[in-house]
Amino acid sequence: ATYKVKLVTPEGEVELEVPDDVYILDQAEEEGIDLPYSCRAGSCSSCAGKLVSGEIDQSDQSFLDDDQMEEGWVLTCAAYPKSDVVIETHKEEELTA
């Protein structure tokens, strides 16, 4: 399945179609959208975003704890969409504050 992923970035909103077996960060890059990242392995906070609505699968990530995930934190480099989603990007400073 392919889902609509809306990214709310500091530069504005952007919408892309992301298959459910492709990481959101990877698809964004393919479409020329510049998102922050570092490790690309789900083990740091560089790519962190906040899930506004929808459902993702980020079981590959190892950085966020259960409480953070319940609060809606998402690592875009290790997140697959499981429904149409809206994510606020560029949130690392807020997460690590």
Swiss-Prot record:
Details of cofactor binding: Binds 1 [2Fe-2S] cluster.
Primary residence: plastid
Cofactor(s) needed by this chain: [2Fe-2S] cluster
Gene3D superfamilies associated with the record: 3.10.20.30
A GO cellular component entry from the record: chloroplast stroma
Residue sites binding [2Fe-2S] cluster per the record: 39, 44, 47, 77
CDD domains: fer2
UniProt xrefs under Pfam families: Fer2
Known function: Ferredoxins are iron-sulfur proteins that transfer electrons in a wide variety of metabolic reactions.
Family named by the database record: Belongs to the 2Fe2S plant-type ferredoxin family.
NCBIfam families: fdx_plant (TIGR02008)
Protein name: Ferredoxin
Record organism: Hordeum vulgare (Barley)
